[in-house]
Amino acid sequence: MAVHNLKDLLAEGVSGRGVLVRSDLNVPLDSDGEQGRITDPGPDHRVGADVERTGRGGRQGGGRRAPRASQEWAGPGVVAGPGGRRARRAAGPARAAGLGRGGHRRPGPRRGVDRRRRPAAGKHPVRRPRNVQGRRRAARAGRQMAELVGPTGAFVSDGFGVVHRKQASVYDVATLLPHYAGTLVAEEIAVLEQLTGSTKRPYAVVLGGSKVSDKLGVIESLATKADSIVIGGGMCFTFLAAQGFSVGKSLVETEMVDTCRRLLDTYVDVLRLPVDMVAADRLAADAAPQTVPADAIPDDLMGVDIGPGSVKRFTALLSNAETMFWNGPMGVFEFPAFAAGTKGLAEAIAAATGKGAFSVVGGGDSAAATAVELQLLFPLVRLIARLA
């Protein structure tokens, strides 16, 4: 089945039509969260159509309100509930990009979609959405989203990290409207093909994050293609435990230890583990960090970042790479005391990119880390912030 893209939609014509664009907006809606996905929706919002933007987001945490932590967004107005003011603030860059007044609240029902008559094409802006989560049936929400653009409307799927999800704003609405792949989806597929096909060598991969189970497929896929794979973040402790090393109170997926041992045996010349770690007695901003050997973390401490010796070793490796892919932070970068490893490797990747290497940063966490620590280096690195 052929995949229709934005060029096909433009060829058909968008004048007088509504276009529903699904973006990947799944970021924490708090004062510290990274706003890149909200403030930089991408080129599909500049095609001159009457655009409605949809997405899904939420707040971190659990408790009694946890079932409502995720919200699907669609249609006129702003996010109803947590993060509403944040979405309105994020609308500011939309004005600078010529997208209209995004985030403008129109009168209408507090919940659901405003079904009032749509303004004439081109007369209203790209709008931040109203919360449509909490409906008993996702199909109903999908129908209401489709109603936003009317019977002549179209649906553009531009959230690469969510295209596989069976959500109202991804799946149901696509069954109701002519649908097209957005520019960002097409670009990210092209980049991934470059990373998994013929690449310039040396080819280095940097993987972080909490769990080996989340990255197992990536490791097994790239281990036969890359020259080296750096393992950091919380996932490195399961690999260290698989070698029989003491990891203290660090995160370990016990059910993945045998898998890590197999990977280490199979790809001994490819996988690279830290030689030292930054450790602390607890995960807190005021916890005192100390550097310890990676193979002998004290029982009363947990690893929270890769150490300076590891940063030096991995920086030397990355400085010679011609192709690089980074997915996941090296430590708990949200706390400045535990962010040096992530920042150091990001600087190394940016420096190599400035000399002509091809580099890709993928994944919400590592993209956020780059944004927070290295905003001036952003133009040097191909960022796939939507790649999970």
UniProtKB/Swiss-Prot annotation:
It is an enzyme of class 2 (transferase). The keyword Glycoprotein does not apply. GO terms for cellular component: cytosol. Keywords: ATP-binding, Cytoplasm, Glycolysis, Kinase, Nucleotide-binding, Transferase. Substrate binds at residues 24-26, 37, 56-59, 117, 165. GO terms for molecular function: ADP binding; ATP binding; phosphoglycerate kinase activity. It comes from the Bacteria. GO terms for biological process: gluconeogenesis; glycolytic process. ATP binds at residues 215, 303, 334, 363-366. PROSITE patterns: PGLYCERATE_KINASE. Residues 102-136 have a biased composition (Basic residues). Residues 34-55 have a biased composition (Basic and acidic residues). Transmembrane segments: none annotated. Its EC number is 2.7.2.3. Residues 26-136 are annotated as: Disordered. Gene3D superfamilies: Phosphoglycerate kinase, N-terminal domain. Pathway: Carbohydrate degradation; glycolysis; pyruvate from D-glyceraldehyde 3-phosphate: step 2/5. The keyword DNA repair does not apply. It is found in: Cytoplasm. Belongs to the phosphoglycerate kinase family. Monomer. This is Phosphoglycerate kinase. It comes from Mycobacterium avium. The lineage of its organism: Bacteria, Bacillati, Actinomycetota, Actinomycetes, Mycobacteriales.
